[in-house]
Amino acid sequence: MLKKDDVTPDFNELNLAQLSVEFDNIVGDRTLAINNSANLYTNAAREKFSISSLQYFISNLEITTTAGKVYVVNQDSSYFLISGADKATRFAKVRVPEGDYSKLKFTLGVDSLRSTMPLDKREGVLDPAYGGGHDLSGMYWGWNSGYIFFKFEGNADVISNDVNGDPTGKHQFKYHIGGFGGYSAPTLNNIKTVTMDLNPGGIAKVRTGRQSNIHVLVDLMKAFNGTNNFSIAAHPTVMFSDFSTKVAANLTEMFKHDHTEN
């Protein structure tokens, strides 16, 4: 906790301290629970559903001081894969200059530059083989040579058992949203930028020897109930299609700064 007489330090890009951004996944007014078949969620279309998997990329963090100075986190240290099944992954921890910060900006997804870099520049969670491939826990389309930015799966009884739903009879929905604009030819671009004003919930006071934590709520219900409302029954599977742009537009509405712990 900061002292009452805390003085804002001079901005010095060589004087770095730790900043944490916490992505707290919720579903409406409830905490996210994976495999919640005993206590289903209900969306605006009154469809009951459970969630079996959630993963998304956060990258390219950028923060702005109360005086207007912008600091871009070193890109090599600015890629995070948040997993709903692993609470330890909810923190994006970076090092930034000591100071008072009133704005946070980040990318939901993986930028086109990194997406097209040689494999030795895409390690860890960016390794295309990470997670065992697209059909398992992987976040990379081998057939499309691109990252899945947002992977959201679950089950809902409203999904039909035919080709318009889930022919396997498992009533499964899959939303795999990606697309960085294309390498050699233009394609879908679902990269999204989120900017947050930290003033209402409290600015981040980053100091050496302490950890400031920006607490962000991520409401998954907005994936269905955002600007582009849709039903699970009508769109049980969305991947690399035109409709993915509507889902992607909803995703930016999931993020809301709740408070900051200094």
Indicate residue ranges for each PLM-predicted region:
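A short, solvent-exposed, low-complexity linear motif enriched for acidic/polar residues
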Residues: 4-262
